[in-house]
């Protein structure tokens, strides 16, 4: 779970925003826990101590990314550093997507089959790609070499034959960037 952003458009740390009585990042992590993800790694940055406190009691490994201000790729790299070597895959989730539930993770995992050239599982809604994305271990080195804040775009371009798009609901497109997104979230549907 990438939870190290600067929240520059929001001002305050959006990951700590109260959503139904819980911090936003806790919703994301709890959904992964319900999906029976083997190990959940949370990469922190800004307000690291507060993010860790928001996750207290959940079985997660928290690692701090001191370079979080240099882009998402630094957090991705930091998270990959602690993934066990025998892992088959990682599900890269963004901490600011509180509507992504365990069904999303479960559907992506069900679609995963590197032997059948489905080593990158991407959720889509109405033709638009979203998050989280499931990546096979064979992509870890390339992921760790990414730079800046471009996310997966370049990796998608160089690995297009390995991608399977998994149709899902609009939760995979909704993230919180500004205060108005919190208002919109309350109108859409409460996260679990």
Where are these regions (language model features)?
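Short glycine- and hydrophobic/aromatic-rich loop-to-beta-strand nucleating segment
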Residues: 131-135, 174-176
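A general boundary/transition motif marking the beginning of the first structured unit of a protein
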Residues: 39, 143-144
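A short local structural element in Rossmann-fold oxidoreductases
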Residues: 11, 52, 144-145, 186
């Amino acid at each position: 779970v990438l939870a190290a952003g600067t929240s520059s458009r929001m001002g305050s740390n959006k990951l700590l925003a109260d959503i139904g009585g819980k911090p936003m990042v806790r919703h994301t992590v709890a959904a992964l826990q319900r999906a029976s993800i083997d190990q959940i790694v949370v990469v922190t940055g800004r307000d690291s101590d507060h993010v860790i406190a928001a996750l207290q009691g959940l079985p997660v490994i928290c690692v701090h990314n001191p370079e979080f201000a240099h882009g998402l790729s630094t957090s991705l790299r930091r998270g990959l550093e602690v993934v066990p070597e025998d892992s088959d895959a990682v599900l890269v989730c963004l901490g600011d997507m509180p509507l992504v539930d365990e069904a999303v993770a479960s559907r992506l995992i069900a679609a995963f089959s590197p032997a059948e050239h489905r080593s990158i599982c991407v959720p889509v809604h109405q033709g638009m790609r979203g998050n989280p994305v499931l990546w096979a271990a064979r992509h870890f080195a390339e992921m760790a070499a990414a730079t800046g804040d471009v996310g997966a775009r370049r990796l998608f371009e160089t690995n297009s034959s390995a991608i399977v798009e998994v149709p899902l609901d609009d939760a995979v497109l909704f993230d919180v960037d500004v205060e108005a997104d919190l208002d919109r979230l309350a109108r859409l549907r409460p996260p679990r």
